[in-house]
Amino acid sequence: MYYFYWLPVGTDVRVRTTPWVTLSIVLTNLFVHGVFLASRGDAGTLYALAFKAAQPTVATALASLFLHAGFLHLVGNLVFLSVFGPPLEARLGPARFLIAYLACGWLSNLAQAAAILAWWPELVSVPIVGASGAISGLMGLFLVRLYFARLRFVSVTLLYFQGIAKPAAFSLPSIVGIGLWLALTLAYQFAGVASETAYIAHLSGALFGVVFGLVMGLAPEARLERHLAMGSRYAERGEWFAALGEYESYLAKAPADPEALAQAARLQRVTHQEGQSAVRFREAIRQYLRQGDTRSACDLYEEMRRLLGGEVVLPSGDQLRVARGLEELGRPSEASRAYEAYGKRYADRHLGTLAMLKSADIQRRVLNNPGRARYIYEELARRPLSGDVEAIVRDRLAASERAVERLHRGAA
């Protein structure tokens, strides 16, 4: 006897936010199931809350989404929800995601009830419970919004008579994985396998999910994000020019995405397009600063400096904001270097002089590096300065020289 069990366990798409709605649905399902376990399976209450074709109501159609026939039924649904929920919630937003989830579940229960009334009237009083219709709706939405993704699966092949149990892990394109699931569901429906399972709810839920995805305009978003996914896959395989082409296509429609700009800059560096790489790095940093993400801007500035070498300088305002950001983030060495780069690039400006002073002060007071501070003060002293500024520079230069002498005497 041969059995093959498979279960999705993840996707290759990024989730950048905490999926609060998905977590809330998971916890609500667990709480409701725990309450019924604590009440030792109150069948009367469960039956009253469950959706039935003979007595279809909006309230029971929604309540049934949080009721399950048993622990395995619950766990199976929550596994699917945990795979498909977070990436969709991150892209649809909490409100649209919750509405789509509940609507697919409600409509799929109505579809199951209609099928029972039409073809299996003897089942009109059998309760319909479970979140399968809603989760099937998420799978339909996934086909529209994230059709380019890959799904990760685990499987177990059982050969009972031979005593063999073989686990495996594999991945499939989402269209193939979900398509196989739909095909099996359809086959089970016609074959009458596990007839107590609401296969019509599964199939109709997926259909409603596809319809909702198209109505919400998710297809254009999907085509755009596909460029990022393909670019990432090409880059992982070392196909740099193909990857860069995908990012270029994406940026043609979303030119202000700092992460895509940064990735394109890295690819241009790898393909020896240093000039274009610098332009893209600078634009990515500017976009991070506009978004108020100073940490990412500072990190990318340092990455740009390492990859491109030399004196990396941003436009005036951006360079100062990055220098201040590095200082506020507790990275004094990098901040001093950024201030110094500004001071050298914009030497003819008053702010350039102040930036050099700031750089030297960080070296002297924070990093306890009077030698480096002296070098910067000496460079400043060679510039034409106003009387007050020149006096400050001379005074701090003298203090640095004394500190260097003390270090030398201590070393001796």
Descriptions of predicted regions:
Residues M1-L251, E259-L267, Q276, E283:
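A detector for small-residue-rich transmembrane helices and their helix-helix packing motifs
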Residues M230, A264, E283-A284, V322, ...:
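Structural register within alpha-helical repeat arrays
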Residues Y250-D257, R290-Q291, L307-L314, Y342-G352, ...:
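Short solvent-exposed coil/turn linkers within tandem alpha-helical repeat scaffolds
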